[in-house]
Amino acid sequence: MRLTSAMCRRGVGLSLGAFLACISTLAATPVDPSGAVSLPAVSIPYSIFASDEARRQFVESMMDPSAPPPGSSIEATRSFYDAFNSNLVSRMRKRYAAVIKTERIGGVNTDVVTPVQGISPENQKRVLINLHGGAFMWGAHSGGLVESIPIAVIGKIKVITIDYREAPEYHFPAASEDVAAVYGALLKTYKPSQIGIYGCSAGGILTAESVAAFGAKGLPRPGAIGTFCGSAVDVKGDSAFIAPILDGQLFAEKPLSAFDLLYFKDVDPNDPMVFPGASTTVLARFPPTLLITGTRDFAMSSVVRSHELLTQAHVESELHVYDGMWHAFLIFPELPESNAPYSVIAHFFKQHLGQ
């Protein structure tokens, strides 16, 4: 039987062998010797596994024209994201009743978030540190509250979010030095096993950096950590190319690297204090690690690779990948796909932090 393209498209009355031949025929795409694939123009539907709420938020986020364009002043960028995050904080507080107070710890400004209903008995001697996202340039205060409020309330635990130093005023390793200062101060009250650290995007990268820095400074490792939409290796791999397309952006021949960020000016890309995945020895000192990402997150491959490297280093590592979810999707409180990881995060620290 001679296969035609029409028969393949219909797929009716074909044997298994013919059906597989059709797949091969229809899916054939030029692949060069390096493994690079040239793709034709395609229309990719949104994930059938994602919620209606996620679909609406995805469209709204990707079509929002109000974000400042690349090259905008740092003042304009910070102003935009502070307003953006402040709106999210208001939405968070309608769902999650929290008490917020500012406190200077270890010489660093922080916001301390606790649940209105009180900290659970098992968490009285536990604390979480949040490291906010924002490309190491924005996210102080409001961005940290977005990431801290739901975890504090769902987990019934105290969360301290740190306003670490950012670019362009400061560069690596200023942020991890601030985290170490707060962590060191908390060690006067808590055992290291009672302290957890987590962050999203830049905060996920900073969480991994901070654990590496603790080891270099002779500080004990914390009880557990979470790195979300950013982790122990640079933003590379398939998702760095594919996710922008899935998010409706133009294809980039050279995707953005963390080393393009102002914060990492003039750093050594092989320095394990920047990306601990560069050293198995450094990774082997990591505590149990929770990793979260989405299939439309440009950092997905780096998070998956971090999980793989942690596993190879015999570190307990737990990976969750949410279908159809984009970078830092956890900041939207209305999504079922955000509420699911909130519970995962709370449970992970409940299971791994000491009493």
Give the location of each predicted region:
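Bacterial N-terminal signal peptides
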Residues: 13-23
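Short, solvent-exposed secondary-structure boundary motifs
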Residues: 1, 28, 88-95
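Phosphate-/polyanion-interacting regions in eukaryotic proteins
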Residues: 74-86
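Bacterial Sec-dependent signal peptides at the C-terminal "C-region" and cleavage site
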Residues: 22-30
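Intrinsically disordered, low-complexity repeat segments enriched in small/polar residues
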Residues: 7-10, 26, 117
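Bacterial N-terminal signal peptides that target proteins for export
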Residues: 2-15
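N-terminal intrinsically disordered, low-complexity tails enriched in polar/charged
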Residues: 4-6, 29-42
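Alpha/beta-hydrolase superfamily serine-hydrolase fold, recognizing
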Residues: 31-35, 44-73, 94-355
